[in-house]
């Protein structure tokens, strides 16, 4: 199980990303439309103003049950070993059992 502080930090990053998503998207559109390099630098400075944790690249997918940040399956939102346990216990509908 991941530490509660790490899970909380990840949720905080998700909130920040949602908050600043429109600002980042509009700034990127402006940069692509403007041909002047000096104006692009000004807009790029505006793009750097939101907090670092609001960048979408800083987000991690985490396992819903354990909070583990690695070996996650996007379709299920679970880490590998939890997914395997749930499939063997027939808790995931549509998933077939196999040993790997």
From Swiss-Prot:
Q: Where in the cell is it found?
A: Plastid, Chloroplast
UniProt cross-references to Pfam families, sorted A to Z: Ribosomal_S14 (PF00253)
Keyword terms, alphabetized:
Chloroplast, Plastid, Ribonucleoprotein, Ribosomal protein, RNA-binding, rRNA-binding
Alphabetized InterPro entries for the sequence: Ribosomal_uS14, Ribosomal_uS14_bac/plastid, Ribosomal_uS14_CS
GO-annotated molecular function: rRNA binding; structural constituent of ribosome
Q: Enumerate the PROSITE patterns for this protein.
A: RIBOSOMAL_S14
- GO terms for CC? chloroplast; small ribosomal subunit
Where in the chain are disulfide-linked cysteines found? none
Similarity comment: Belongs to the universal ribosomal protein uS14 family.
Quaternary structure, from the entry:
Part of the 30S ribosomal subunit.
Q: Which NCBIfam families match?
A: PRK08881.1
Name of the protein described by the UniProt record: Small ribosomal subunit protein uS14c
| Lineage start | Eukaryota, Viridiplantae, Streptophyta, Embryophyta, Tracheophyta
Query: Gene symbol?
Result: rps14
